[in-house]
Regions:
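Conserved small/polar residues in nucleotide/adenosyl-binding loops
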Residues: 147-149
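Short internal beta-strands
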Residues: 38-41, 131-135
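Short, charged/polar "capping" segments at the starts of alpha-helices
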Residues: 47, 138-144
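N-terminal catalytic cores of NTP/NDP-binding nucleotidyl/phosphoryl-transfer enzymes
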Residues: 4-33, 38-43
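Short, flexible hinge/linker loops that cap or flank conserved catalytic cores
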Residues: 1-2, 98
Length: 149
């Protein structure tokens, strides 16, 4: 284990949660030697159409069932208790305050990476966390020019 606690956050509607979500966090844990992954269900993403089918309690329960074999996965309802819209920056500030000595990572898909410059106050967010970007099998490689936010 490193000198600092390494924590990654995966936010999303998780409606429904699926094997891909768990595969991603397992891969991130393995590749980066993460100590913890926080699954952060949101009320409403400002970047997606949100017509959720499952309610908040059901989505948290789905996450709990999907992750119960992994003691390094934590489910946080913090964002569910915030006002809309739900910005990643506010969650990053919260977790930086909660874990001041930790190195924080934010897991996103290539679809969101392509829109990263439209995220609320992205410059401050990028100072608080390091992005982990996953691509789907058939997606083209990352546009690394976006790294210079």
């Amino acid at each position: 284990m490193s000198e600092f606690t390494k924590i990654a956050i995966l936010g999303g509607s998780f409606d429904p949660v699926h094997k891909g979500h768990i595969q991603i966090v397992k891969q991130a844990k393995s590749d980066l030697d993460l100590d913890k992954v926080i699954l952060l269900p949101c009320q409403r993403s400002p970047h997606k159409d949100n017509n959720t089918i499952a309610n908040e309690r059901q989505r948290v329960e789905m996450l709990s069932l999907a992750s119960n074999q992994h003691d390094w996965i934590e489910i946080s309802d913090w964002e569910l208790n915030q006002e809309n819209p739900s910005y990643s920056l506010l969650a990053a500030r919260h977790f930086k305050e909660t874990y001041p000595e930790a190195i924080l990572y934010w897991i996103i898909g290539n679809d969101q990476w392509k829109k990263i410059t439209t995220w609320y106050n992205i410059a401050e967010l990028a100072e608080l966390i390091t992005f982990i970007v996953f691509t789907r099998d058939k997606e083209c490689p990352l546009d690394l020019s976006l790294i210079h936010i």
